Amino acid sequence: MARTLRYLLCGILALAAGSNAVPAARGSTRAAPAAEPSTSATTYEAEDAILSGTTVDTAQEGYTGSGYVTGFDEASDKITFEVESEATKLYDLSIRIAAIYGDKHTTVVLNGGASSDVSFPAGDTWVDVPAGQVLLNEGANTIEIVSNWGWYLVDSITLTPSAPRPEHQINRSLNNPSADASARALYDYLRSIYGKKILAGQQDLTWADYVTQQTGKTPALVSVDLMDYSPSRVERGTKGTSVEEAITHAERGGIVSALWHWNAPAGLYDTDEHPWWSGFYTDATDFDVAAALSSTDNANYTLLLRDIDAIAVQLKRLRDARVPVLWRPLHEAEGGWFWWGAKGPDPAKQLYALLYDRLVNHHGINNLIWVWNSLSPDWYPGDDTVDILSADVYAQGNGPMSTQYNQLIDLGKDKKMIAAAEVGAAPLPDLLQAYEAHWLWFAVWGDTFINNAEWNSPEVLKTVYTSDYVLTLDEIQGWQDS
């Protein structure tokens, strides 16, 4: 996440997933729930809901009912739907929207508590966007659609009783045929727990120790950032320590994940507004990844190789220490706020392929399990170089993040394990199980998140870390031999 700004908490909470939108197929207006248990869909019209700061309009053609809701121009603007359920039950939620002003995000809040973020694709027509699942109580419930990015139109929501999740069909082996014994052992262990347990994780060893102080339990997984090994940072005096932290956690029986806030190889603005150490942001550099990859003869392509080779040195240290790594490069690419995603999906996928080839085939680094970190099929580099899928989700309420989980199920055809690689709020175990959101691990970001009661209260952390469903460091000892 890069978190001097995370990102000013400005609503960048879930990545775009425009391809998940499906053409509208309506036919019902607001319907009363059936008296007997039903598997049929129920649609609630937005204009019949409770409006706060929003208004009903009819200018956009194609709406259902008597109108639609617009006016999402303030953070507090929302629609509150009052919905009924004949029993405590899980439902698939979809939102019929028109994002006529560009790609958008909204926040869905269930019964005033847990929230999740949903992305809307830009378009000039009405579409039904899958919005995850909601666990309704027997009787009355509320579903709020809260502004977030704002500037979109809402026609209705539809609730359909969720079908039971089928058994996962996870690939039995890693893509790299030369994967070393440590990587294979870790992958086998992860397969053995997937869908049954979740690994508790934390970004940075310092904040893992904070969790131990707060809960009496230590995260099973620690994520480290190779950011300070970027050559454009090293030449300005940074000294990375994350490899040592990773080895420390591995030596006490833990599992290691790594990401890389890749400071751009060149073209850093280095101004008061955009200092050199923020050089992974698109708006802090003029480095053009598409141009750099356009020819192997240009100077910036050579700089890409230089940087990858510098990170290879650090990954080899972990390899030589027999530490397998859940390796998550080019994270959040589809967001566009990092330079590696600034030019669209094709250059990002090309860069990922270069990383894979350079690290695996050129350097022979075989202790890596490759983790991809975007939701949209347009950005997916392909099954052959991705072992695990993941999402970064920053939404308050300690919810199950079922929207993103279900998107990744579809992306990987349920053959890839799925991780919540970065979260702002640790998910509550009871909700994870109720929603059948079988995240492999979660890793809470550090300062301003794990130590912020608005995101992770002490009570919630203790609930999470003492749950039988959540694996902590003491509970995974000997995983290498399992």
Curated annotation (Swiss-Prot):
InterPro entries from the UniProt entry: CBM6, Galactose-bd-like_sf, GH26_dom, Glyco_hydro_26, Glycoside_hydrolase_SF
Record keywords, A-Z: Glycoprotein, Glycosidase, Hydrolase, Secreted, Signal
Subcellular location: Secreted
Active-site residues per Swiss-Prot or TrEMBL entry: 332, 422
Activity control mechanisms: The activity is completely impaired by Ag(+), partially inhibited by Zn(2+), and enhanced by Co(2+), Ni(2+) and Cu(2+) by 22.6, 14.5 and 20.8 %, respectively. Ca(2+), Na(+), Mg(2+), Mn(2+), urea and EDTA do not significantly affect the mannanase activity.
Biotech utility: The addition of Man26A as a supplement to the commercial enzyme mixture Celluclast(R) 1.5 L and Novozyme(R) 188 results in enhanced enzymatic hydrolysis of pretreated beechwood sawdust, improving the release of total reducing sugars and glucose by 13 and 12 %, respectively.
Domain annotation CBM6: ranges: 42-160
EC number: 3.2.1.-
Keyword Signal: yes
Principal subcellular localisation of the protein: secreted
UniProt record similarity statement: Belongs to the glycosyl hydrolase 26 family.
Protein known as: Mannan endo-1,4-beta-mannosidase
Phylogenetic lineage: Eukaryota, Fungi, Dikarya, Ascomycota, Pezizomycotina
